[in-house]
Amino acid sequence: MARLQEFYKEKVVPGLIEKFGYKSVMEVPRITKITLNMGLGEAVADKKIIENAVGDLTKIAGQKPVVTKARKAIAGFKIRQGYPIGAMVTLRGRAMYEFLDRLVTVALPRVRDFRGVSGRAFDGRGNYNIGVKEQIIFPEIDYDKIDALRGLNISITTTAKTDDEAKALLASFKFPFRN
């Protein structure tokens, strides 16, 4: 069992029950999945970009991402339907908790001028999104071997019904909120 998973069961669940007054353990919000998405519009010109991005996401997530394709053609962006334009990976279970652990303890503190993540990035339904500008904040990525700096979106999906519950859940995982 992952370190954060044990921490969730032993410390987070009792803390949230006390704070929000849940009657059942099953009411306590939990993280269901973490989705990493890398949009690569520049991949239209060069197919190598997709391969490099897939390699980077594989190292970061620990599992192979799926290449996302354009749903419809957009002439202004020179994209045809079916063109590979991104990569995404969904983490659940043990891999999800291990990634969250690495994100909070190692990766986020490596961001330049890091003061904490925004507490306003919730979607109104208890899910949280973080945009990362550079993939080199993850220790798995070797700075000398990357071809370009690419950003990615990290989406944390929870079972929380409100943003306050989700923020309390993530804060109990030592998420560094600045507000």
Curated annotation (Swiss-Prot):
GO terms for molecular function: rRNA binding; structural constituent of ribosome; tRNA binding. One of its GO terms (cellular component) is ribosome. Pfam families: Ribosomal_L5, Ribosomal_L5_C. Belongs to the universal ribosomal protein uL5 family. This is Large ribosomal subunit protein uL5. PROSITE patterns: RIBOSOMAL_L5. PANTHER family: 60S RIBOSOMAL PROTEIN L11-RELATED. It comes from Burkholderia multivorans (strain ATCC 17616 / 249). Gene3D superfamilies: 3.30.1440.10. InterPro entries: Ribosomal_uL5, Ribosomal_uL5_bac-type, Ribosomal_uL5_C, Ribosomal_uL5_CS, Ribosomal_uL5_dom_sf, Ribosomal_uL5_N. This is one of the proteins that bind and probably mediate the attachment of the 5S RNA into the large ribosomal subunit, where it forms part of the central protuberance. In the 70S ribosome it contacts protein S13 of the 30S subunit (bridge B1b), connecting the 2 subunits; this bridge is implicated in subunit movement. Contacts the P site tRNA; the 5S rRNA and some of its associated proteins might help stabilize positioning of ribosome-bound tRNAs. The keyword rRNA-binding applies. The keyword Ribonucleoprotein applies. Part of the 50S ribosomal subunit; part of the 5S rRNA/L5/L18/L25 subcomplex. Contacts the 5S rRNA and the P site tRNA. Forms a bridge to the 30S subunit in the 70S ribosome. It comes from the Bacteria. Keywords: Ribonucleoprotein, Ribosomal protein, RNA-binding, rRNA-binding, tRNA-binding. GO terms for biological process: translation.
